[in-house]
A protein has these predicted regions:
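Trp/Phe/Arg-rich N-terminal binding region typifying the photolyase-homology
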Residues: 1-115
C-alpha cells in the first residue's frame, strides 16, 4: 500500500497545516516527528523549547488519534531516520512544512532535499 509521509517539525498542529492537508488529499498518511539531538544541542535551543515541543506533540498525537491516526515520535538524524522508515515501509511522497530555523536546520533540510 502506498502512503505519504508527513514530517512534522516545529509546526505541531493540524489546523491549516498545508503539508498535512496535501498529503491527506492524496491518500493514507504516516505522521512522524523526528527528535534530532544535534538540533536540540544548538545554542538557540532551550529546555523550555523542548518541553513545549513535547507538550505540543502530545496534543497533536491526541488530535490525530481522534481522526484515527497517530504521531510516531522518532529519535535520530533526519536522513538516517528517513532511510530506516523507507527501508521498513517505502513511502511515495514526503511532505513537511517549510520552517524558519537556524543554520543547522537549514543544512538538515538541504540534506533531506538531496535524499
Amino acid at each position: 500500500m502506498s502512503y505519504g509521509l508527513v514530517w512534522f517539525k516545529r509546526d505541531l498542529r493540524l489546523a491549516d497545516h498545508a503539508a498535512f492537508a496535501a498529503a491527506a488529499r492524496r491518500g493514507p498518511v504516516l505522521c512522524v516527528l523526528i527528535v534530532e539531538p544535534a538540533l536540540w544541542a544548538q545554542p538557540d535551543a532551550a529546555r523550555q523549547h523542548y518541553e513545549f515541543m513535547l507538550e505540543s506533540a502530545r496534543e497533536l498525537h491526541a488530535e490525530l488519534r481522534r481522526r484515527g491516526g497517530r504521531l510516531h515520535l522518532l529519535v535520530g538524524e533526519a536522513v538516517a531516520v528517513l532511510d530506516r522508515l523507507y527501508a521498513a515501509a517505502p513511502f511515495d511522497t514526503l511532505h513537511s512544512h517549510e520552517e524558519t530555523g537556524n543554520a543547522a536546520s537549514y543544512a538538515r533540510d538541504r540534506a533531506v532535499a538531496r535524499w
